[in-house]
């Protein structure tokens, strides 16, 4: 499950969210597990809390959708950017730029199903089978074959989540 900051209309106050986020940061630090961050239009609050808290082993910015300056700051802090279908949307050139500049070890791809359906299926319910379209877009941005990106993000996921792939 994710935790984080959401400045949407029907969300708890940022103070309540911050308290929950700090609890989850402590839990991630104590357990050695990755911290999966949800962020919607709350970049400044989120970055402030993360800068002011203990650093978990891995911080993943799930369904990354923030501006390029936030991507750069997040990457500088060692956070992982997880790209969803929104990276394929025509208007999201900054997300594609973030995919280009991210160090290889700081990239993941995801579906965020049932939301953020990638092109060419935008508007339909997102399905796990569509993650290949997101991966293909990120691969193209990085000048990689989709298979190479698949190997890269599989290795990253195994490292971040402590999964032994038996290879």
Regions found by a protein language model. Name each.
Residues 105-127:
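Short acidic/histidine-rich active-site segments
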Residues 130-167:
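Mid-to-C-terminal alpha-helical segments outside catalytic/metal-binding sites
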Residues 29, 100-101, 140, 159:
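Solvent-exposed polar/charged
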């Amino acid at each position: 499950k994710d935790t984080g900051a959401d400045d949407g209309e029907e969300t708890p106050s940022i103070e309540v969210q911050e308290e929950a986020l700090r609890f989850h940061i402590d839990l991630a630090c104590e357990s050695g597990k990755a911290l999966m961050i949800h962020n919607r239009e709350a970049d400044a609050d989120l970055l402030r809390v993360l800068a002011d808290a203990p650093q978990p082993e891995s911080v993943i910015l799930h369904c990354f959708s923030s501006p390029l300056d936030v991507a750069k700051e997040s990457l500088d802090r060692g956070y992982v950017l997880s790209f969803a279908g929104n990276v394929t949307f025509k208007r999201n050139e900054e997300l594609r730029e973030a995919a280009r500049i991210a160090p290889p070890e700081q990239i993941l791809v995801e579906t965020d199903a049932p939301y953020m359906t990638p092109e060419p299926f935008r508007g339909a319910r997102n399905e796990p089978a569509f993650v290949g379209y997101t991966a293909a877009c990120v691969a193209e941005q990085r000048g990689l074959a989709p298979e190479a990106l698949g190997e890269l993000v599989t290795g990253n996921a195994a490292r971040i989540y402590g999964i032994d792939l038996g290879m």
